[in-house]
Amino acid sequence: TTVVPYNISAHWGVPSGKNRAWVDFQNDVTVKDIKLANQEGFKSVEHVKRYTTLGMATDQGKTANVLAIGVMAENMGQTMEDTGTTIFRPPYVPVAIGAFAGRRRGMEFYPTRYTPSHNWSTEQNAIFVEVGMWYRSQWFPLPGETHWRQSVDREVRQTRSSVGICDVTTLGKIDIKGEDVSEFLNKVYANAFAKVPVGKTRYGLMLREDGIVMDDGTTARMSENHFVMTTTTANAVSVYRHLQFCHQCLWPDLDVHMISVTEQYAQYAVAGPNSRKLLEKIVDPECDISNEAFPYMAAGEITVCGGTAARLFRISFSGELAYEIAIPTRYGDSLMRVLMEAGEEFNVIPYGTEALGVMRIEKGHAAGPELNGQTSAYDLGMGGMISGKKDFIGYTLGLRKELQRGDR
């Protein structure tokens, strides 16, 4: 038997004269484009790829690159092996389904965020709860307390009768600066913000475009063109994204600049009848926080513990005399320990999110579960906050009679 060898050779294209011969159908790359790239000095496959956009469409060259390499090799009078290939990218290289689906591996791949007082709270045997990615102290059980209600009731009673401290670092914090910040805030909040005095804080209600409550929180005017906004923990990211959208897309002509500083500041609520006395022990003497100098809803820059810069806000979500003090995060753990030591004579206690919720509800504030994306300002008893003297996001749809119905 005689074996006749086949004379097979690659045929990469038919000379077409002036007609176009397509190589990459997705990016409209032709044989002429590849030859032109070679003529202009692009000999490497990677260079030709970027010069012509060959293989840079959704298939990443899966349907065109072999043909293109053959055309290049033929044009330069060399083999395909000498010409080389581009770097393989998905979906050219098979990917295991497990890489997409994955599997639970405990907490290995779960992102976590810890408050500055986390180590101290752990030392106090705090019970933690996941709030978004944060771990927050839920309550602080003492020896002999066998039920969480015992701990929470004690924390509430002690805070109301003397003083308690709660880590509220997880609240969103946004620094906003610019000549038009007042006008900007007046457009995003349902209540008036155009004339907030310097050194004052105002509670604000923010609505979505459909009139449903998005978030609530306080915003302090630190100077003429500098405001500090706080948001709820759960909505810190969504509110910041909302503000960016409002500025960039709705009112780009306003002079407004903002940045999230949630992780840059540790913040503690100091609440109770003795809260001012406790703070006076750590606030530097030149900073007057008396009732006359620092009244309700005041805000200002202070120094503590011999010159450490801090921010102080006289706001209360507990129904008692209360303050919130913010300090650079690196001092957060130390400040918690200093506050607890300074408050020993007042029998200061730490309180967690459960006691915070109890006191917030008893005062009549909206609690976290009520801001669930389904409630209106009227559902929360805040219909009176909606200004009728200005336009703002959610104004028109927020006044629908259906949202004001008492039996919703």
Could you tell me what each predicted segment is?
Residues S9-V29, K35, A57, W134-R136, ...:
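Cofactor-binding beta-sheet edge motifs in enzyme active sites
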Residues Y51, L67, V71-L207, I212:
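Acidic, proline/glycine-enriched N-terminal capping motif
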Residues R20-D24, N38, A57-K62, R103-P111, ...:
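Hydrophobic alpha-helical scaffolding
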Residues P5-S9, R154-S161, M206-D216, P252-L254, ...:
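Short amphipathic beta-strand starts and helix->beta connectors
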